[in-house]
From Swiss-Prot:
Region of interest: Disordered: 108-180
UniProt key word Repeat: yes
Keywords linked to the UniProt accession: Repeat, Secreted, Signal
Protein name as annotated: Uncharacterized secreted protein ARB_06108
Keyword match Signal: yes
Source organism of the structure: Arthroderma benhamiae (strain ATCC MYA-4681 / CBS 112371)
Amino acid sequence: MQLTQVLAVAILAAGVSAGHRPHRPHSNKLEIQDIKCQSGAPYCCSPDKTKGSTCTKLTGSSVNCDSVVVCCNNNGDKHSPQTCSASVAHPITFVDVDAKFRIDHNKVSHNRVNAKQRRDDKKDYGKNDYGKKDYGKKDYGKKDYGKKEYDPKDHKDYDHKDYDHKDYGHKDYGHKDYGHKDYGHKDYGHDDYGYKGYDDKDYGYKGYDDYY
């Protein structure tokens, strides 16, 4: 009897592996595959919990629920379609496998579907032709505003213009020589007024003394 049970389990396991189809649970069970209940997930239930039962609260270090599990909300209500989003990798919708057996639990790659495949879109946004415009190397640079020929264009050369050729500093104003003008040549100090000889005049020689 025991050998028969072992063989039956082996045959069942081989069939599941070959067909990649999970074992259909009992009609009163809820089932979710490959859920990571990290530390902080308040409730993580094993597959033996039935609908309406209360889940066991798990605390402490992270718990890897790699087998078929059910994540419950705080009040333990596991009925579909409630969402379990308590610190798990992805929000999880409870599946009533008795009513809707639509998930292939052996195929987790359905969560890795490329966005392009999901959209059925062939635009390939990652390699779009937007880059061909190449705004960074556009011909704006050929105008070369920085080296425009404003300076050598007119050669006005304001700094060396002929304004300075008038030579205001050395103009001929100084040649009049006001300091050495001929005013001094009149020689007022040595004028001939003194030569009139008033002191030596002949007033004393009029001959008044000759009356005696």
